[in-house]
Amino acid sequence: RLASADYFSMHFGKWHLGGKVPPNGSNSSKAEILSCNQHNWNDPLIDGPQTIGFDKSRITVEGIQGAPYSFFRNGYLETTKNDIKLWEVGEYPMPQGTSMIREGFPGEGDISWDSTAYNMILVNETNDFLDDHLKNRKDDPFFAHIALGATHIPHR
């Protein structure tokens, strides 16, 4: 673990190494993963970055290409159930371009989901992490892993 070597660590971006939603009973369909009562939002994601020792994280479990279309900070859903909507397949005009939900991948997510802003959200989060680290731990080592969404579809 990085922590045993006194590294302060972060992972921002897509996380394809687990990140399963904690069950609260039986499983539901992936499309309704956020609003159903079959998940326990008081517990962090199972096998999220925090599980393997990252000090900070802000992730999406499927990147920009699959539900849930929401960020999770340090293992916990960032939005509330009141701010969840079903994203249907389609194209959604956004200030920075066209956000897309691909055929076969409708699903729930944050009402403010915008795949075109994804990378800049992660870049800004990384800058904040680095600024904080240099201000508060400038003599300590750090590890920063950023998994941007630009290498994946959908693109527009």
Per-segment meaning from a language model:
Residues 1-156:
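Formylglycine-dependent sulfatase
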